[in-house]
UniProtKB/Swiss-Prot annotation:
Superkingdom of source: Eukaryota
Gene giving rise to this polypeptide: ASNSD1
Record-annotated Glutamine amidotransferase type-2 domain positions: 2-184
Name under which the protein is recorded: Asparagine synthetase domain-containing protein 1
Molecular function, one GO term: asparagine synthase (glutamine-hydrolyzing) activity
Stored InterPro entries: Asn_synthase (IPR001962), Asn_synthetase_domain (IPR051857), GATase_2_dom (IPR017932), Ntn_hydrolases_N (IPR029055), Rossmann-like_a/b/a_fold (IPR014729)
Protein species of origin: Bos taurus
Pfam families cross-referenced by the UniProt entry: Asn_synthase, GATase_7
PROSITE patterns registered for this protein in UniProt: GATASE_TYPE_2 (PS51278)
Any single GO BP term: asparagine biosynthetic process
Length: 640
């Protein structure tokens, strides 16, 4: 994970040897292990590159990297497959080596088409004065652009800063493909032309042309007039990394496999009925296999202390977790945690991060330890809010519980995981957030991370994910509760399951209105817009803590496998809630030995954590959120 930035100026009066302080600070929070800046100047333009690294694999490689020909590379990504990267190697160096060997545009596109894993990048090709940049197919890594000064400068960055009342604000770079800017031509013409090399969505020529035309129109709509978007003249494309969605419909009328299910009490045995079918069981086993591989890649590609003596390994209380799971106890996070348990070394704890928003000031974890003992290596008070109130709260209500829905299911899920593997240390971290703390940190830290997204839903989920991934809370054990700060640099999240497996209520609405054909179109739309609705925002809020978000359900092989299945093998919305939606995932949970969690219906994070109940109750999720507006104009990082 990295914070990457490139500020380009076309006029001498806008040349600068440094980024503004607030932007630099935001980038450093993403990459705390190394910071470096590099200046490239020509007669026509200046490029200031800034790289900030979170070290997760191979040798620590400072960014930006450069070669003897003047090429410069900034990489914010992880290669999990497609290009070979040995355990001791750094994928930044591998990518730059291959890029420097590319002889033409086709070679560059071929290289990025091979990469499986999340990425965003900026590449300056000195010989052609070209600046290449883009995001992966799903947009799993944030990249923003900011055009200002009537075409005299622009900036690309993993994260921005915002101010209200300014028209030329940061926007997300669309995950439509890779872009190239001819900097020399732009400096002469005083207009920026974005050449798009789009993802190839299908094999049909007319369909491709229509998709490219639609992409160009959508991108241009949000840009200033001096920025033009055009398809590349050679009509070159990136190869789509996943197979197309199977839109097939059943030949016979679609009915539930077991009509008596809807009239029966829902139990784990209800799901076992489906697994008696040989084909269904085989498909579920295949799904478990591909998802397990995705989780394995994401929990093993990170540095571990392999030099501990056997005596130190036995001191499990001193062992730090390297991996955390955003954990509600729901079906998505339970399956991710169960699969992570299969691959993470047994002597290593796993942090389960469970967030809840408090409606009462005097709310603490059950069985709070009044002595305030601190656990070795994790002794950090989670927030100012608890520093102020912990002593009084402990005396007033030592056994009071915070019973928001996600806390209840989280505790139940913890017991399931402990029963499945009692040898593992499962760190259940209760993260409790007060209204005062929410409002203060939204104002000072979170709002600019969520932006340029701006809805009530973005506010709720963005804030909830920020507090959860921070990992500052209470570690609840049989002996009581202790202040705890998660040390995990990798945070697993279940995003992508609902979009692919008909987990949202809107899938049910579409199915009831338009049947399986409508459901297919809804799922296709969900996957197509996930980059602009969710992933850039989540990457920005999680990375703000110097941690990296990893998304197993959006592994290219997982998506391809699910895309290859007909929709009725993934979900059956004629069945009751808690079974029909995400049916294949529930069957996988049963096969993995999970119990009650396999039957939990979908509950959105903003409702399960109760953040949606903290402030206004009469808002719609799609409304623009006034709480995200920043009052001061002093925070803008790129001069106007």
């Amino acid at each position: 994970m990295c914070g990457i930035c490139c500020a380009v100026s076309f006029s001498v009066e806008h040349f600068s040897r440094d980024l503004k302080e607030d932007l630099l600070c935001n980038l450093k929070r993403r990459g705390p292990d190394s910071s470096k800046q590099l200046l490239r100047s020509t007669v026509n333009y200046q490029c200031l590159f800034s790289g900030h690294v979170l070290h997760l694999r191979g040798l620590l490689t400072a960014q930006p990297v450069e070669d003897e020909r003047g090429n410069v590379f900034l990489w914010n990504g992880e290669i999990f497959s497609g290009i070979k990267v040995e355990a001791e190697e750094n994928d930044t160096q591998i990518m730059f080596h291959y890029l420097s060997s590319c002889k033409n545009e086709s070679d560059i596109l071929s290289l990025f088409s091979k990469v499986q894993g999340p990425w965003s990048f900026i590449y300056y090709q000195a010989s052609s004065h070209s600046l290449w940049f883009g995001r992966d197919f799903f947009g799993r890594r944030s990249l923003l652009w900011h055009f200002s000064n009537l075409g005299k400068s622009f900036c690309l960055s993993s994260v921005g800063t915002q101010a209200s009342g300014v028209t030329d604000q940061w926007q997300e770079v669309p995950a439509s493909g890779i872009f190239r800017i001819d900097l020399k031509s732009a400096s002469i013409s005083q207009s920026v032309v974005l050449k798009l090399y789009p993802w190839k969505y299908s094999s049909g020529g007319d369909d491709i042309r229509e998709c490219v035309h639609n992409s160009l129109t959508e991108i241009s709509a949000d840009l200033p007039t001096f920025v033009l978007v055009a398809a590349n003249e050679a009509k070159l494309y990136l190869k789509d990394p996943v197979v197309p969605l199977n839109m097939a419909l059943p030949q016979a009328a679609f009915e539930t496999h077991c009509s008596s299910i809807s009239r029966s009490p829902l139990t784990r045995e209800t799901l076992r009925v489906f697994l008696t079918d040989g084909h269904t069981k085989e498909v579920v086993q295949q799904f478990i296999g591909v998802l397990s591989t995705a989780v394995k890649r994401r929990v093993l590609c990170l540095p571990r202390d392999e030099n501990l003596a056997p005596s130190e390994v036995l001191k499990t209380s001193n062992r730090k977790a390297n991996v955390a799971v955003l954990f509600s106890g729901g079906i998505d996070s339970m399956v991710i945690a169960a699969l992570a348990d299969h691959h993470i070394p047994l002597d290593e704890p796993i942090d389960l991060l469970n967030v809840a928003f408090m409606t009462k000031e005097k709310t603490i974890p059950v069985n709070f330890n009044k002595k305030g003992r601190k656990q070795a290596n994790h002794c950090e008070m989670p927030s100012e809010e608890f520093s102020k109130h912990a002593a009084a709260t402990a005396a007033a209500s030592p056994g009071e519980q915070l019973s928001v829905p996600d806390r209840v299911t989280g505790r139940a899920g913890l017991k399931e995981l402990q029963a499945a593997n009692p040898s593992r240390i499962w760190n259940f971290v209760e993260i409790n957030v007060s209204l005062e703390e929410l409002q203060r940190l939204r104002r000072t830290r979170i709002s600019h991370l969520i932006q340029p997204l701006d809805t009530v839903l973005d506010d709720s989920i963005g804030c909830a994910v920020w507090f959860a991934s921070r990992g500052a809370g209470w570690l609840v054990t049989q002996d009581g509760a202790q202040p705890y700060q998660s040390s995990a640099k990798v945070v697993l999240t279940g995003i992508g399951a609902d979009e692919q497996l008909a987990g949202y209520s809107r899938h049910q609405v579409r199915f009831l209105a338009h049947g399986l054909e409508g459901l297919n179109k809804e799922i296709e739309m969900e996957l197509g817009r996930i980059s602009s609705r969710n992933l850039g925002r989540d990457d920005r809020v999680i990375s703000d803590h110097g941690k990296e978000a990893r998304f197993p359900f959006l592994d290219e092989n997982v998506v391809s496998f699910l895309n290859s299945l007909p929709v009725w093998e993934k979900a059956n919305l004629t069945l009751p809630r808690g079974i029909g939606e995400k049916l294949i995932l529930r069957l996988a949970a049963v096969e993995l030995g999970l119990t009650a969690s396999a039957l939990l219906p979908k509950r959105a994070m903003q409702f399960g954590s109760r953040i949606a109940k903290m402030e206004k109750n009469n808002e719609k999720a799609s409304d623009k959120c006034g709480r995200l507006q920043i009052i001061s104009l002093e925070n803008l990082s790129v001069e106007n």
